[in-house]
């Protein structure tokens, strides 16, 4: 009888350890899902760590026309940078597998070092890395078209 009670006790201890592991794994999975959900729904502000006066030039390639242009005018650079900085973006969908784009835009400091680069697809969409980011409109897409006409002619 003692042998049977010992086996039952060992079995109960094994089951208790198994339950602890299951609870621990479940908690870790829940925390990861919660963290990813919070991260996904957080707003993003592009160029938020950069002072507009530190950006000295912008290079743009129009994926629709194949034209590229650069501009260094302080007011134009400031307008584009401040416009992008003032727009809160939210992650939308994965950008994997999508082809083509509007404006590929790169920002450079006074030494010609690239600070940031991403794609502006429309007045409400930025594409960077794995995601499309959306806002309620207001990105300087039309202004970039005007600059393209000015600098490509």
PLM segments and residue spans:
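Function-determining sites in protein domains
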Residues: 11-14, 18-153
């Amino acid at each position: 009888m003692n042998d049977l009670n010992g086996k039952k006790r060992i079995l109960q201890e094994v089951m208790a350890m198994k339950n602890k592991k299951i609870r621990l794994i479940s908690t870790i999975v829940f925390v990861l899902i919660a963290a990813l959900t919070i991260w996904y729904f957080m707003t993003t502000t592009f160029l938020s760590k950069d002072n507009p006066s530190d950006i000295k030039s912008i290079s743009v390639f129009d994926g629709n026309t194949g034209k590229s242009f650069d501009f260094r005018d302080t007011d134009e650079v400031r307008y584009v940078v401040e416009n992008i900085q003032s727009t809160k973006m939210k992650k939308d969908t994965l950008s994997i597998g999508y082809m083509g784009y509007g404006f590929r835009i790169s920002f450079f400091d006074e030494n010609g070092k690239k600070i940031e680069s991403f794609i502006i697809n429309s007045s409400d969409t930025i594409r960077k890395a794995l995601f499309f980011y959306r806002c309620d409109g207001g990105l300087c897409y039309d202004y970039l078209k005007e600059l393209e006409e000015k600098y490509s002619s």
